[in-house]
A protein has these predicted regions:
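Active-site metal-coordination/substrate-binding segment of hydrolases
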Residues: 65-129
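Short glycine/serine- and small hydrophobic-enriched flexible loop segments
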Residues: 18, 114-121, 202-209
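Acidic/histidine-rich catalytic neighborhood of metal-dependent amide-processing enzymes
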Residues: 109-176, 180
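Short glycine/proline-enriched loop/turn "hinge" motifs that connect secondary-structure elements
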Residues: 80, 168-174, 237-239
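Metal-dependent amide/peptide-bond hydrolase catalytic core
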Residues: 7, 178-305
Length: 305
C-alpha cells in the first residue's frame, strides 16, 4: 500500500484517539503499553518490552550502520480540576484534538510511529529504533533510563515533545529538594512551643529571591520554585514540623551537586536531594542534524523542562 501524508495523518489521529481513551498516568501505563505493543505487532513488527516501555527495530538491522532512535513517552500527568470535560474522551473541535496527553506527548508518540513505519518500507542507510517509554513525567528510573543500556549503540536520537516543530538542543536539569524544619509542639493559646512554620519562612524567602550568578545563553538562569508545603495537625496546636518541596531547574553551568552545596550554605533547615542524576544536557549547535534543521527554517532553543 502506498502511504501519503493524509493517510498517515488519519492513522496517527485514530491511534492517538485510542491512546487518549486509555488512562496512562505515570507508573500506571500498563494498559496503554499493552495496546500500543499490540498495534505495532499488527503492523508486522516484532516488539521488545521492559516494564511499560515498548520498542521495535527496523527490518534488516545492521550493527555496521548508524542507528537513529525515535522516542517519546506514553505517560501523562494527572488531570487537574480545571478540566471541563472528560479528559479521557477524545474530541475534535475546530481542527484540534482535545484529551489528556493529546499534546504531551501522544501526538509525538503516534507521529514518530508513522514515520518509523513509513521509513521501514524501504531500505535506509541507517537503522531505526522506535521506543515508546514510560515514567517520563516523573523522571522515573523504570522509564527510558532502564531500557537504553540494553539497546544497540545509538548514534542520534529524536525525542518527540510539543515544541511546535522547533528543535530543542539543550534542556535544563532537575533537582527536587525535601526541606524540613523541626520545632516543638505546644498549645496555640499559650506562650509555649517552637513553631516550625516560622522556622521555614526565611528559607522560603531565600529560595524565592536568590539568583545564581551564571546564566546560560540558551537556558537562562537557574530557576528555583517552592511548590509544596505541609505543616500542622489542627488549629490549636503549634506545629513541631514543617516540610516543603523545592523544584530546581539547572543550566549547564552548574551541576546539581554544585547547586546543592551552595544552597546548604544559605538555608538553616535540613535539606535532602531526591536525586542528583538529572543534570542539564545539550547538543552542539554545529552538529550536522542541527545545522540541517536550521537550513529548513527551524530555530534551535533551550527547553526549561
Amino acid at each position: 500500500m502506498k502511504y501519503d501524508i493524509p493517510t498517515m495523518t488519519a492513522e496517527a489521529t485514530s491511534l492517538l484517539k485510542s491512546l487518549i481513551s486509555i488512562p496512562s498516568l505515570s507508573r500506571e501505563e500498563t494498559q496503554a503499553a499493552d495496546f500500543l505493543q499490540n498495534y505495532i505487532e499488527m503492523e508486522g513488527m516484532q516488539t521488545g518490552r521492559k516494564g511499560n516501555n515498548v520498542w521495535c527495530f527496523s527490518p534488516m538491522f545492521d550493527l555496521k550502520k548508524p542507528t537513529i532512535l525515535l522516542n517519546s513517552h506514553i505517560d501523562t500527568v494527572k488531570p487537574v480540576n480545571g478540566w471541563r470535560k472528560d479528559p479521557f474522551t477524545p474530541r475534535e473541535e475546530n481542527g484540534k484534538l482535545y484529551g489528556l496527553g493529546s499534546n504531551d506527548a501522544g501526538a509525538s508518540v503516534v507521529s514518530l510511529l508513522q514515520v518509523f513505519l513509513q521509513l521501514c518500507r524501504t531500505s535506509q542507510r541507517y537503522n531505526l529504533i522506535y521506543l515508546a517509554s514510560c515514567e517520563e513525567e516523573v523522571s522515573g528510573k523504570d522509564g527510558i533510563e532502564s531500557v537504553l543500556p540494553g539497546l544497540p549503540p545509538i548514534s542520534f536520537a529524536i525525542v518527540g515533545e510539543p515544541t511546535e516543530m522547533q528543535p530543542a538542543i539543550a534542556e535544563k536539569g532537575l533537582m527536587v529538594l525535601d526541606v524540613t524544619a523541626t520545632g516543638k509542639a505546644g498549645h496555640a493559646a499559650r506562650n509555649e512551643g517552637d513553631n516550625a512554620i516560622y522556622k521555614v519562612l526565611n528559607d522560603i524567602a531565600w529560595f524565592r529571591d536568590y539568583r545564581f550568578d551564571k546564566e546560560s545563553q540558551l537556558l537562562g538562569p537557574v530557576k528555583m520554585s517552592v511548590t509544596v508545603i505541609n505543616a500542622g495537625t489542627q488549629h490549636n496546636v503549634v506545629p513541631d514540623k514543617c516540610t516543603f518541596v523545592v523544584d530546581i531547574r539547572s543550566n549547564e553551568l552548574y551541576s546539581n551537586e554544585d547547586l546543592f552545596a551552595e544552597i546548604k550554605k544559605h538555608i538553616s533547615c535540613e535539606a535532602k536531594a531526591r536525586s542528583f542524576r538529572l543534570n542539564s544536557s545539550r547538543i552542539d549547535e554545529k552538529h550536522p542534524f542541527v545545522q540541517k534543521a536550521i537550513k529548513m527554517g527551524r530555530i534551535p532553543f533551550g527547553s526549561p523542562t
